[in-house]
Every structure is written in structure tokens, then in C-alpha cells.
Design a protein with these regions (language model features):
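Acidic, histidine-bearing metal-coordination/catalytic regions of metal-dependent phosphoesterases
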Residues: 1-13, 218, 224-225
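Active-site neighborhood of phospho(di)ester-bond hydrolases with catalytic His/Asp-centered motifs
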Residues: 5-7, 25-30, 59-65, 87-90, ...
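Core catalytic region of metal-dependent phosphoesterases/phosphodiesterases
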Residues: 6-95
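Short glycine-/acidic-enriched loop or helix-start segments at secondary-structure transitions
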Residues: 15-16, 36-38, 71-73, 99, ...
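Short, conserved loop/helix-junction motifs that constitute active-site signature segments
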Residues: 18-20, 51-56, 79-82, 129-131, ...
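Active-site-proximal segments of metal-dependent phosphoesterases and phosphodiesterases across multiple
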Residues: 32, 36-44, 132-172
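Binuclear metal-dependent phosphoesterase catalytic core
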Residues: 92-96, 166-171, 175, 182-225
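Binuclear metal-dependent hydrolase catalytic cores centered on His/Asp/Glu-rich metal-binding motifs
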Residues: 98-135, 153-166
Length: 225
């Protein structure tokens, strides 16, 4: 199975180049921008209209922190499913024998959607990701995996979630997919990473760069399983 992983399109989805020969496309969140859910809703619906028309048999969407209209249920799971899109929110799906888990949650940072305090995330992951699977899709990265950014004092930091990293290293799925942390200044987060001594490939599918919205700086990642 050939998979196209994309994330953080932030309304620029129509700038993507659609690769050939893809069996499954997975978008790991942030198709939209506005914090206000009523302003956010039209952007998510515009994305759905584009996503449903992709010439790819299987399509998965996992929401991100900018997708406030989904958190508030102005856009629902049924809205995705009625358009042939699988929406995952702390649940599994199996496609052609490949078992996939998806969750929108990220560590708290401001007042955005699907965010939880880091102290609560470990319990959430352990309860939600309770079965072995081939692919884990979460909006945000595990700690130390394509997750670098700058804090308010311009110091580089690793923004990912440690409890998610621990769980992934315990379970070792074939792939761990995420976005959320974009390329930033001289930091390249988009791409793939494999940690020494472990089998899992980590994929940051974000396609934009902070401070350079309006164009794409990545076209996502191609995976095979």
C-alpha cells in the first residue's frame, strides 16, 4: 500500500501536487485557520469539497488544533463520512489489513481545539491507543521527533509530547504520523525520521513554513507498507 501523508495545509490544499499511484491519503490536521468556530467552518467545508474529489480510493482525516469547528461539532464525523472520508477521533480503522489509529489531541498551548494539559495526555494515550496497530496518526509530534521550534525568547525548544513518544516506542508501529510543528526559520521539521534502535518511522507531513504562509514548502511524505 502506498500512502501520501500531508498535514497543516491551512487552506492552501489546492496548491498541492497530487502524486500518482496512491492507495491512501492521510491528513493529520489543521486544514483551516480561524480560532472562531463559526469563521472556521467554511474553511473546513471547503477542504472537504477538495479532499473528496482526490483520485485516491481511501482518505483519512484527523483534526488539528486549528480545526475549531470540528471540536464544536459544527462540522461532524458524518459530514466527512458522507463525502467518502474516514474521520478518526480516538479510534481505529482497518483498511486492506492495515490497522490505523487517529487522535486530534495536542499539549495545551493557548486556547485552541483538542488541547489537553500534558499531565492528562499520558492517561489519554494509554486508554485510547490500547491495541497494537500499524500506523498511529496524531496531530502533534512525540518529543524529540521533528518537533523543533523557537520559544518567545528565541531559544530553540523541542515541542513534542514525551508521553506519546514513550507509548510509540513501547508499541513500535510501522509509522507514526503527525504535523502541528511546521518548518520555522532555519529549522526543517517536515520529512521523516527513524530513531536508532527502533523500527518506527516518524513522519511530519506539514506543508507550510511559519512566516511564509501563502505558499507550500513541502508536498508531504510518501510511505509504503
Amino acid at each position: 500500500m502506498k500512502i501520501w501523508h500531508i498535514s497543516d495545509t491551512h487552506t492552501y490544499h489546492d496548491l498541492l501536487t497530487i502524486p500518482n499511484g496512491i492507495d491512501l491519503v492521510i491528513h493529520s490536521g489543521d486544514c483551516s485557520n480561524p480560532r472562531d468556530p463559526y469563521n472556521n467552518e467554511p474553511e473546513v467545508r471547503d477542504f472537504i469539497d477538495w479532499y473528496k474529489e482526490l483520485p485516491i480510493k481511501n482518505k483519512i482525516y484527523v483534526a488539528g488544533n486549528h480545526d475549531t469547528s470540528i471540536e464544536k461539532r459544527l462540522v461532524t464525523k458524518k459530514d466527512f463520512e458522507d463525502n467518502g472520508i474516514i474521520y478518526l477521533e480516538n479510534e481505529y480503522v482497518t483498511i486492506d489489513g492495515i490497522k490505523i489509529f487517529g487522535s486530534p489531541h495536542t499539549p495545551q498551548f493557548g486556547q485552541w481545539a483538542f488541547m489537553k494539559e500534558r499531565t492528562k495526555l499520558e492517561r489519554l494515550w494509554r486508554l485510547a491507543i490500547h491495541e497494537p496497530c500499524d500506523i498511529i496518526v496524531v496531530h502533534g509530534p512525540p518529543k524529540g521527533c521533528l518537533d523543533k521550534s523557537y520559544d518567545r525568547n528565541n531559544n530553540m525548544e523541542s515541542c513534542g509530547d514525551k508521553s506519546l513518544l514513550n507509548l510509540v516506542l513501547d508499541m513500535q508501529p510501522v509509522y507514526m504520523l503527525f504535523g502541528h510543528i511546521h518548518n520555522c526559520k532555519d529549522i526543517i521539521n517536515a520529512g521523516m525520521l527513524k530513531l536508532s534502535g527502533y523500527d518506527t518511522w516518524f513522519s511530519n507531513g506539514s506543508v507550510v513554513t511559519d512566516g511564509k504562509f501563502g505558499k507550500l514548502t513541502s508536498n508531504g511524505n510518501i510511505l509504503e507498507i
